[in-house]
Structures are given as structure tokens and as C-alpha cells.
Amino acid sequence: MTQNNILIRRYIIVGERRFSNYWWAIVIFLGSCGFLATGICSYLGIPNWLSLLNIGTTFSSETETLASGIVPFFPQGLLMSFYGSLGFLLSIYWSLLIFWNVGGGFNEFNKKEGFVRIFRWGYPGKNRKIDLSYSLKDIEAIRVELKQGLDAQRTIYLRLKGKREIPLTGIGQPLTLKEIEKQASELANFLQVSLEA
């Protein structure tokens, strides 16, 4: 997403607040609740609530169905509890990342005042706000890096004097080759610097 002006350009970086992260946090939470419920039910020696849903579909007696719905605690119930706890903790962690919006922020290129500002949200603590500011005079080039393979990476870098490179694209934010080329060329034209591959 871009907010354009003649003298100011701002590119919004989404960070952790993507639909896929919401989806996986919810799916992992629901799955872990099922695993935990099964583990707790097996520990207490009561039929699992999921097996009670099958009572009306089987032709055996109700006592056989209830007895077959009890999962032995060792090793199945113990493992189900372990995986459920792990999944629950993972979903809580993922939810906190979404809440904190880790990696979210913006890249601002301001010709009016002559600076580049790169802002990102990090993990809570002393360095929660990552706010970098550079003069436009320090920018040497815009560089595009394309890595092919199973985990293809397409990154736009801002190269400063002294060969320091700062990534401008967000992590986990896949852009098509056409989008990355367009964004990099627009940025190089706006800043009037060279574009390197």
C-alpha cells in the first residue's frame, strides 16, 4: 500500500497483521483445545466429548460406545496433552505477535524536508520502536535482490554511502516479480538514484 504525494512517498508495511496469521492462530488454537480436551478426558477416565458425537451413528450399545471413547492416558492421552499444550502456547504467541504488530510500519521518502524514514514495530521492551532516519544525500542506489529456489526471496534494499544496505520490503510479504520491479523502479525514479540488480 502506498500513500503518494509529489514530494512525499510513504509505503505501508503490513507486518504480522496478515490474514494468514489470523487464520493460523485461530486454527492452531482450536486444534490445541481439541488435543487438550482429549488428554484431560483420558487422564480423568471419562469419555472424550468428540466420541460422544458418534453415539447416534453407531449400532452398538451405548455402554460399548462410551467405553470405546475413553483414550488410555499413557501414552496417547499424555501425548495429546503435550501437543495440546504446545499448540495452545504457539497460538498465544502468534496472537501476541499480531497484537504487537511485529514488523509493521512504513518507509517514508520525503523530498520536501530531505530525509528517508524507516519505521518498524518490534517486540515489547526497550527497542520496541525501530525508527531510522537518513538524509536523501546519503542514498547511493536502490538494489533489488532476487533469490530463486524453494523459499524464493525478493527484497528491495536502500544502499547508503559506506555500502550499508537496509531492506525496505517486509518479511513474509511475498511480492511478485512484476510488483517488486515496479516498486523499485518507481522508488529509484522518485529519489533520482540508480537501480541495481
Swiss-Prot record:
The chain crosses the membrane at residues 21-43, 82-104. It is found in: Plastid, Chloroplast thylakoid membrane. GO terms for biological process: photosynthesis. Pfam families: Ycf4 (PF02392). Belongs to the Ycf4 family. Seems to be required for the assembly of the photosystem I complex. HAMAP family: Ycf4 (MF_00437). This is Photosystem I assembly protein Ycf4. It comes from Chlamydomonas reinhardtii (Chlamydomonas smithii). The gene is ycf4.
